[in-house]
Amino acid sequence: MHAHVILAAGQGTRMRSRLPKVLHPLLGKPMLLYALEAALALKPERLVVVVGHGGEKVVEALEGYPVEVAWQKEQLGTAHALLQAEGLLRDFPGPFLVTQGDTPLLSPRTLEALLRRVREGAGMALLTAELPDPTGYGRILREGEEVLGNVEEKDAPPEVRAIREVNAGAYAFDGFLFQALKEVRNENAAREYYLPDLVAIYRAHGRRVLAVRGVAEEALGVNTREELARVEGVLLRRLRAEWMGKGVRMILPETIYLEPSVELAPDVTLWPGAVLKGKTRIGEGCEVGPYAVLEDTVLEPGAKVLAHTVAQGAHLHPGASAGPFARLRPGAVLMEEVHVGNFVEVKNSLLHKGVKAGHLAYLGDAEVGEGTNIGAGVITANYDGKRKHKTEIGKKAFIGSNSVLVAPVRVGDRALVGAGSVITQDVPEGALAVARERQKNLEGYALRKLGEG
């Protein structure tokens, strides 16, 4: 049994953003949720998030999670922020885990190691890491496992700044925590109450303070846009490695972007520059071409999305293909063996088995029957300026190039629409519809006009 407190009240001025720092996205998900999910993995008895700057937005992001919220009205430092949780946890005996909302790389295993030290008798345990460049972090003074002190960088003399072992911002405490917090003073350059000052307070009360050396990567926090990009790179590298370990082929993996919510099956091939977002799900043997973008899109086994195609909220069934340079908008459903080619846009439309739309077409609010061919330049004119209307095309029909089908309209099974037609009435099954002016040839006119006759 333990309680976990996540500190998420900081303003994040160096981000230069109106968005609270902990809500900046990492791989499509707010930074804070990484810290929250690591905390939940250890099944805490109580989970408190301390919010402050932009707190209303932060609380909104926490909706649906089993958390309690404490407020820090004034930004007076990390110790002051943690003290705001006392009202919720006053009767909780401990131990307590404390982490930061802007440190998203911490693993449950590392947090468990901190907690274990307190359960084994330490009063306080803090996570440390050795960084090649420790700029911006508090430095650790220690003797063996025992921590002698923790000095904030802004208050550190040069010889202490030279130390590369830093405070990674994660702690475990025994039940003495809130009593100790009330002894923290703000006698420092920033006039703030620092959480690391608890090291000296715990030691003064005869309680052991231990360091747990962690992986340097996990200590990375986010205070600037550059650090945000660095942390996102770490998360991406981990995610790519995980999927390649499960049988996904990535060609030039360092160029591929994907989010944790994406699901991939074995033998999927991702070409350079592929972007996979949201609830995208890709089945076995599928291929995603160079610089294709898929968001909330499903590819059933064997489907292909070719280069530079953008798909949002689409569903491709086995053997279907789209691209290159196709656009599939929400509600686009391509059944088995459908092919949508270059510069074809499909929106809120069902294309039945074997439909071909090779190039330069727009299919919106349409249903196209099995085996039908859509010629180049075909448009379903679905919008009359006020409402959207449906176009229905039957099985094995042929829609000639550069035709416009003005909805609402139906073209029957095995019907033909002549090239260049504007269809405003239903076309019966098996009929030929031609809606254009009859061609006239004026003999000799061109030669006379050009003066060569």
Curated annotation (Swiss-Prot):
Keywords for this protein: Acyltransferase, Cell shape, Cell wall biogenesis/degradation, Cytoplasm, Magnesium, Metal-binding, Multifunctional enzyme, Nucleotidyltransferase, Peptidoglycan synthesis, Repeat, Transferase
A Gene Ontology term for the protein's cellular component: membrane
Enzyme Commission no: 2.7.7.23, 2.3.1.157
Pathway: Nucleotide-sugar biosynthesis; UDP-N-acetyl-alpha-D-glucosamine biosynthesis; N-acetyl-alpha-D-glucosamine 1-phosphate from alpha-D-glucosamine 6-phosphate (route II): step 2/2; Nucleotide-sugar biosynthesis; UDP-N-acetyl-alpha-D-glucosamine biosynthesis; UDP-N-acetyl-alpha-D-glucosamine from N-acetyl-alpha-D-glucosamine 1-phosphate: step 1/1; Bacterial outer membrane biogenesis; LPS lipid A biosynthesis
Gene name of this polypeptide: glmU
Region described as Linker: spans on this chain: 226-246
Record protein name field: Bifunctional protein GlmU
Xref: SUPFAM superfamilies: Nucleotide-diphospho-sugar transferases, Trimeric LpxA-like enzymes
Catalytic activity: alpha-D-glucosamine 1-phosphate + acetyl-CoA = N-acetyl-alpha-D-glucosamine 1-phosphate + CoA + H(+); N-acetyl-alpha-D-glucosamine 1-phosphate + UTP + H(+) = UDP-N-acetyl-alpha-D-glucosamine + diphosphate
Subunit structure: Homotrimer.
Entry-linked InterPro entries: Bifunctional_GlmU, GlmU-like, GlmU_C_LbH, Hexapep, Hexapep_transf_CS, MobA-like_NTP_Trfase, Nucleotide-diphossugar_trans, Trimer_LpxA-like_sf
Species for this entry: Thermus thermophilus (strain ATCC BAA-163 / DSM 7039 / HB27)
Residues that, per the record, bind acetyl-CoA: 376, 382-383, 401, 419, 436
Sequence similarity: In the N-terminal section; belongs to the N-acetylglucosamine-1-phosphate uridyltransferase family.
